[in-house]
Amino acid sequence: GSDFDPAGKSDAEVMRFCQSFMTALYRYIGPDIDVPAGDMGVGGREIGYLYGQYRRLKGVWENGVLTGKGMTYGGSLIRPEATGYGAVYYLQEVLKHENDTIEGKRLAISGYGNVGWGIMKKAAELGAKVTYFAGPDGYIHDPDGVTGEKLDYILEMRAKDPMHCKPYADKYGVEFVAGEKCWGVKDVDVYMPAATQNDVRMESAEKIAASGVKYYIEVANMPTTNDALNFLRGQKHMVVAPSKAVNAGGVGVSGLEMSQNSERLSWTAEEVDAQLHKMMKNIHKVSAEAAEEYGLGYDLVAGANIAGFKKVAEAMY
């Protein structure tokens, strides 16, 4: 790994780092060995620089060696927003299990990057809406939800300044609360932390529990501290879903990108989305069934742990 932060660096600096990093890494990766993908700080630009250096060093066209690539050199449609899309599909399965529907649901999320934007877009498509979203500078409350042209503006705002969401409030005349997170607001149906690790600590978890909101769906990698997560799991009125299952859509579509690369095909966005939806339904199903099999009821955290452990154990046996 590395501790290089691309924030504030010039394109030339980022390119030089990516080239140097790949020069050290390329011997240990390959389409059938290990396939890195993007994450925080590693977007399409960085993947492009990394792949360019890989090709320069190897002298071959192995576009399956990295995922999250641009569409002109082997990328997949909806890969950037796949984690967010998948999280909403997982939420949809949770609601079905609880004899509920996603139609009309109000979501409070943190983050408005690729993951958060994916949640906003897919929620709007399925009849729900994100009414709260938080950024580094505070949170937005838009009772009408982030839909339509507002989704396009989020992309524009993020490209200009990813550290401030206040311009959204200024443009649409909605509430902005500076320096705060939206954990604890009561006029929502679902909480979805989708920004960074340890976003929700014990103080926030207590506010979430007190709000009376039933659904807590982790999306970012480990967005809840261990003590806060255990506290929320102990709330009888709540359903808690773990990030290790909920955010699998991103790596799932990375797998679909590799499949397209292997077959020399480019699938439509609808084809990729349908495969992603099927994938998330199955992830929820096996997690719920694993928990039930071991007498744990509808404990999705335990179910995901058990299902994941069993799959690895069976593969190693």
Model segments located where?
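Flexible, glycine/charged-enriched surface loops at secondary-structure junctions
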Residues: G30-D39, W61-E62, E98-R106, A290-G303
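Conserved phosphate/anionic-ligand binding catalytic regions in large, soluble enzymes, centered on
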Residues: G1-P6, G70, G75-G84, A241-V253
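N-terminal ligand-binding/catalytic initiation module
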Residues: G1-L77, K311-M316
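Conserved active-site and cofactor/substrate-binding residues in soluble primary-metabolism enzymes
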Residues: K9-S20, G41-R45, Y49, I78, ...
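Rossmann-like adenosine-cofactor binding region
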Residues: G138-V240, A245
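Glycine-rich phosphate/diphosphate-binding loop of Rossmann-like nucleotide-binding domains
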Residues: K69-G70, G75-D187
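Glycine-rich beta-alpha junction loops
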Residues: S2, G41-V42, G135-I140, V246-A248, ...
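Adenosine-phosphate binding glycine-rich loop
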Residues: A209-Y317
